[in-house]
Amino acid sequence: MTGITRRRIIAVGGVVAIGAGYSFARKFAGHFTPPPEFEPISDPAGFRRVSGGSSSLGANPFAGLDGTSEESSGLPVTEVRDSICTALYGEEPLAPGTVPVASFSDFYCPYCRVQTKELARLEDRMGDKIRVAWHELPLLGEASLLASRAALAAKRQGAYVRFQERLISTPFRANPGYLKALSEEIGISYSRLTADMSSDDVGHDIQVSAALADIFGFVGTPALVIGRTVIQGQVGAATLKRIIELERADGWSQVC
């Protein structure tokens, strides 16, 4: 074997070893990632906060809307405080070991679109280990409010997820023509959709989400409550999974 060939083999072997070492180091580091730094919240009691990433900010829960609108006045804060876990996660009982996640988003917040898709993938992968409750928090104007009402109205016809998937995947702003075409495409009644959009029930759902945002101090979207952990801003899949596992281990249900 010549000196040149020997040096080439050694060099290639070194590169392979470095690559394998780097891969191992990444996996090793993943198992020993420092836990998030939690900050206890005094109100509501029992919850804790952890820092998130980017968010789209609003001056108030319904920025840009007429201040006399039903969503911007008379939020049911007292009602929500009295049953905060039901308001966050819904009335349906959770299976043992399931960690609930409440997601607050605006259809036209770019960070929300990424976060919503990540959460949906995570829910599909983790099965009954988590359950996501989707909250509409339209901060970014009239199109956001219209889209939120439409999604909640579609939920009354069992089509929330399909509506959500389409709305977060299109550059188009919600308007009556687009919502009519979307209703026909996914096979739901547009006349019922429009009736439900203006119903008190849909308005109340939006008010409850706004009241929760007020209680937890959310000033933008996306925002999350995972078990008893409150997060303002977008977070990645690894952080989401870590917090979910910590909530399962720490007993999130102590606050509910």
What are these regions (language model features)?
Residues 115-118, 146-150, 159, 163, ...:
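Stable alpha-helical elements in mature extracytoplasmic
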Residues 98, 147, 220-221:
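A structure-centric signal for secondary-structure junctions around beta-strands
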Residues 107-110, 137-142, 170-173, 199-202, ...:
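Solvent-exposed loop/turn segments at secondary-structure junctions
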Residues 2-42, 184-256:
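C-terminal cap of thioredoxin/glutaredoxin-like
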Residues 84, 166, 230:
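Conserved beta-strand positions that form and line the central face of beta-propeller blades
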Residues 102, 150-153, 169, 183, ...:
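Short, flexible active-site loop motifs that bind/organize anionic cofactors or intermediates
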Residues 8-139, 207-210, 254-256:
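Extracytoplasmic thiol/disulfide redox context detector
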Residues 123-183:
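Structural microenvironment flanking redox-active thiols in thiol-disulfide oxidoreductases
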